[in-house]
C-alpha cells in the first residue's frame, strides 16, 4: 500500500489541474501528442477546438503545420496524404461539415491511414436543427472508422492520447473519430488533470509508417485502382484490423492506467443495470 501511495503521489505531482472545456482538452491532447499537421475549417460546435489549437500554435506551445482549408473536403484530404507521408495528424468537423468530407472519410480507412478526428456532434440541419445528434459520426460506422464517445473533458483528453496510440499501431492503421456532444461537452468547462509531457512520451511512441511510408526514397503507389475482387479483399483486411483493435485497446488502457494512474474500467462500454442481463 505504501508503494502504491508513493506511485500515486508521484503521478499527482507530475500533473497540473486546469478549468477547461472539452474542446480545449482535445487541443491540449494535440499539443501533448506533438501532432505534426492540423487542418481546420470552421463549423459549429467543433470549431472551438481549432480556435484553441491556433492559440497554442501562435503562442509557440505547439510546433505544427496548421492549415486553414477552403472546406471540409480539402481539410480531410490534406491530413489523409500527410499521414501517408508519416505525419501525425488531427482534424475534425460537425454535422453537415462532416458529411461534406465524406469522400475522404470513405477512402481513409481502406488506405489504412491512421488519423484522429474530433466530431463535435450536431444534427444534420434537418429541419434547421443545430442541437446534439449522433447521425454525423454514425455515417462512418461501417466504413472502417473506430468510433469513440466521451462523457467529460478529462475523458476527451485521455481518449485522444489513447486514440493515437491505437490508430498508429502497425497492427491497426485505422482512423479514429472521437465524438463530443456539441455545446454540452465542447463548450462547458470542467476541472481536467493535464499530464506531464514526460508521461505522455512514455505512453505514446512516435508514428512509424515503416515500409508503407510515402516518400521520394520509397516510391510506392497509394490507392491503386482495384477491381471488385480486390475491393472485397480490402474490406476483409479492414475488418481483420478492426477485430485486432480489441487487443490493442486493452493494451493501451492497461498502459495508460500504469503510467497515469487513471482507469476507465471496461474500455468498450459503460454498464448500467446489466448484472443479470442475457442481452444488452
Question: Positions of the model-derived regions?
Answer:
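Conserved anion/nucleotide-ligand pocket segment
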Residues: 146-149, 154-194
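Short acidic-aromatic active-site loops that bind/stabilize oxyanions
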Residues: 15-20, 149, 153, 242, ...
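Conformationally flexible catalytic loops at phosphate/diphosphate-handling active centers
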Residues: 176-270
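Generic recognition of stable, solvent-exposed alpha-helical segments in well-folded globular domains
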Residues: 48, 155-158, 247, 251
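A short, charged/proline- and glycine-enriched loop
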Residues: 274-279
Amino acid at each position: 500500500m505504501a508503494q502504491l501511495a508513493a506511485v500515486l503521489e508521484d503521478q499527482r505531482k507530475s500533473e497540473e489541474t486546469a478549468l477547461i472545456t472539452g474542446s480545449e482538452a482535445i487541443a491540449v491532447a494535440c499539443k501533448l501528442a506533438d501532432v505534426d499537421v492540423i487542418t481546420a475549417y470552421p463549423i459549429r460546435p467543433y470549431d472551438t477546438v481549432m480556435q484553441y489549437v491556433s492559440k497554442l500554435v501562435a503562442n509557440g506551445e505547439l510546433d505544427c503545420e496548421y492549415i486553414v482549408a477552403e472546406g471540409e473536403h480539402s481539410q480531410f484530404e490534406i491530413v489523409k496524404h500527410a499521414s501517408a507521408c508519416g505525419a501525425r495528424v488531427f482534424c475534425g468537423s460537425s454535422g453537415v461539415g462532416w458529411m461534406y468530407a465524406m469522400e475522404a472519410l470513405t477512402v481513409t480507412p481502406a488506405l489504412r491511414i491512421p488519423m484522429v478526428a474530433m466530431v463535435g456532434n450536431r444534427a444534420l440541419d434537418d429541419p434547421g436543427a443545430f442541437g446534439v445528434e449522433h447521425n454525423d459520426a454514425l455515417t462512418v460506422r461501417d466504413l472502417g472508422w473506430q468510433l469513440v464517445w466521451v462523457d467529460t473533458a478529462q475523458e476527451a483528453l485521455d481518449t485522444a492520447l489513447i486514440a493515437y496510440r491505437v490508430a498508429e499501431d502497425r497492427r491497426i492503421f485505422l482512423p479514429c473519430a472521437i465524438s463530443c456532444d456539441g455545446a454540452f461537452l465542447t463548450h462547458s468547462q470542467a476541472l481536467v488533470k493535464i499530464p506531464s509531457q514526460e508521461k505522455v512520451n512514455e505512453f505514446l511512441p512516435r508514428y512509424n509508417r515503416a515500409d508503407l511510408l510515402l516518400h521520394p526514397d520509397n516510391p510506392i503507389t497509394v490507392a491503386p485502382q482495384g477491381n471488385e475482387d480486390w475491393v472485397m479483399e480490402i474490406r476483409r483486411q479492414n475488418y481483420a484490423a478492426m477485430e485486432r483493435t480489441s487487443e490493442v485497446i486493452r493494451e493501451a488502457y492497461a498502459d495508460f492506467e500504469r503510467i497515469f494512474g487513471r482507469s476507465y474500467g471496461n474500455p468498450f462500454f459503460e454498464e448500467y443495470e446489466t448484472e443479470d442481463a442475457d442481452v444488452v
